[in-house]
Amino acid sequence: MNALILCVGQLKERYFTDACHEYLKRLTRYGSFELREVPDLKIADRSGTPGEDGLTAQEREVIRREGEALLKQIRKDDFVVALAIDGKQLSSQELSDMCLKWRMNGRRTVLVIGGSLGLSPQVMARADYKLSFSKMTFPHQLMRVILLEQVYRAMTILSGEKYHK
């Protein structure tokens, strides 16, 4: 499998970076896996009235600009999977089946994790598939670890290894 995990923001906590590096190291036996970060943008002015979407104009601008940075990393022929609360929830076995399809389609799979404000409408429109791990909201830093662990679990299922229970 050829995959890019594309994220907004840089991990600062060592326990998250250590976990991500461990799963990326484990995944190397199953293909090419890369973790790439784009900068998260700070909101200069937290004042402002939220619109119908619950976001202020400044927050919408941050989401738009982060989305542009993400889209610059995505190639035209990539298969894009956006992590989104309203995406499809899968079991580990079903994710394994999806990973097999993604591996067989011959395209690079790009798994996109948004920042604290989520993904822009433009990134969501570019997504070929929307994946959800829960209806709950997780910190985007933790979501990287969860995603990498689940992809690793999916790869072990495909390989018939004992990791998956």
Residues covered by each model-derived region:
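Conserved beta-strand segments of alpha/beta enzyme cores
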Residues: 32-34, 129
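Loop/turn-to-beta-strand initiation segments
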Residues: 2, 107-112
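Structured adenosyl-cofactor binding patch, chiefly the S-adenosyl-L-methionine
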Residues: 117, 121-165
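Short, surface-exposed alpha-helical segments at coil->helix boundaries
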Residues: 17, 21, 67, 121-124
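S-adenosyl-L-methionine/SAH cofactor-binding core of RNA-modifying enzymes
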Residues: 33, 39-107
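N-terminal beta1-alpha1 ligand-phosphate binding loop
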Residues: 1-27
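Short hydrophobic segments within beta-strands
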Residues: 6-8, 36-38, 112
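Short glycine-rich anion-binding loops that position phosphate/pyrophosphate groups of nucleotides
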Residues: 11, 85-88, 115-118
